[in-house]
């Protein structure tokens, strides 16, 4: 998916006068590690659609592909290890991956509380 996004972005970068914005969703995941951060304190202020910040942590001692997820500067957790490899590689290559909350569920299981999507903004041709 990231390769396709890069090809599309490059083709429109050559013709900026014909460009508009589009979003390609790269993946949708549950938030890992929510129970270890201040999510409980922030919960009442979080909303579906809120922007999240992705922070690459290549020196993380537990996972060299770690990507931390933050809400308004506050750490919430991580992209799950099983889903982070491609995102980490693309971030390391300079791809500006973005994220937002797509589901909030008041569940006992912390893996079910926050679901988010990672996307890339692209330029697309105008008709």
Each model region followed by its residue ranges:
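Conserved active-site motif detector
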Residues: 2-11, 17-127
């Amino acid at each position: 998916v990231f390769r396709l996004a890069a090809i599309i972005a490059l083709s429109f970068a050559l013709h900026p006068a014909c460009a508009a914005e589009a979003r390609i969703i790269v993946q949708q995941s549950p938030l890992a590690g929510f129970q270890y951060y201040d999510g409980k304190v922030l919960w009442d202020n979080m909303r579906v659609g809120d922007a999240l910040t992705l922070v690459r942590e290549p020196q993380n001692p537990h996972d060299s592909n770690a990507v931390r997820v933050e809400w308004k500067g506050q750490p919430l957790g991580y992209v799950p290890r099983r889903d982070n490899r491609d995102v980490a590689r693309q971030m390391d290559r300079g791809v500006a991956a973005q994220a937002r909350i797509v589901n909030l569920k008041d569940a006992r299981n912390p893996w079910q509380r926050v679901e988010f999507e990672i996307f890339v903004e692209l330029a697309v041709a105008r008709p």
